[in-house]
Amino acid sequence: MANINNLYTGEALDTIAGFPTVYHYQPSDYDTTKPLIVCVTGGLHLARVFYGGHDGSTPSNFLSYWLSKQGFSVLCLSYPLETNPPIMPATGANFRISDWGQQAANTTAKIINCKNLSSRSVVLISWSMGGRMVVPFTIAAKNLGLHVQQYIAFAATPGFSSIRPLPPGITCSSSGYFRVPPHVDVFLGQLEEMRVLNGGAVVIPEDVYLREYIGGTPINLIGLGLKYDPVTRAFVRDEVPHEEDTRVLDVGNFPLISALYPTSVLDASHALADKASWGFLLTYKLEHMIGRISVSNMQGTPEWKRLLNLVHDAPERLCVPVPGNHFFFVGESSARDVAGRVAELIDDGTAFERGLAGLIS
């Protein structure tokens, strides 16, 4: 339910790391030493897609509710977005990937300290464009005394520059944000498919979605090689390569990588590419974890064969398909199913790292 500040119940508006943010914390349903799950949203969307809260909203239609039932506390983070009606001050046009990672880490540390959580371990989930901020978040979190034990990509894009041509309709708002495109039919079609997959009840009415769930995005986050120039009040080419901002090839500073990816043709790009893209980064992350010294005496041993099999099987084991499209975690049955898959993936990630350590110790 929204209040006079256009915030939903349980949301907090704050300025953290120099920029506005809205965050939502949901405690675990029972005392636990499980890591805090941090959910970071994607392009054009508030983190409300993880927890809902609009008038008439049903909590069980959203992921945060079911993760709390699994024993996790959940922190959902919205970066600076420009919305109508306004939710945050529109002061984030120059918000960069590095700012995103720092803001998310600072907010995470704040919640862990304020809520007196027993664990300083974190599992990061980021959706869609949120895949670009994983390394900056992990570095900033480590500097704050936090341990990011695992990353789970949700139909997420790694921090490479877009290999596709610039899409049409990129326009700059008066505040310097990338405007919500006039046609968001792709997103609406995907939400409709999720409605059908979840038994037919509307989860987010179209008018509510357009008014309260999406907003203009800082252009630098999108990976198009653009930034906002306050002098010309327009988007211009960014002199900093996107890969330098995202540090996507700094594999040593990734946590253990895992992924949930959609299977619907309505999100064909992620359905086709996510296993390969995150599997690629996972493999190089594992190579970095293993190191040359660890394998120097393994030639011809059974342990070397087991290590090869463990690494080669990792993308299949840790990158898991999920029924649905870009919003595969929205809707009661989908949200409940995905929460269970998240819990299983965290357990499997822990077991995987234990098995790897046993081979290279």
Residue ranges and their predicted role:
Residues 44-58, 86-95, 166-168, 269-278:
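Short, flexible/disordered intra-domain loops and linkers
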Residues 124-134:
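Gly/Ala-rich beta-loop-alpha elbow adjacent to hydrolase catalytic centers
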Residues 168-302:
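Alpha/beta-hydrolase
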Residues 287-361:
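Catalytic active-site module of serine/aspartate enzymes centered on a nucleophile-bearing elbow/loop
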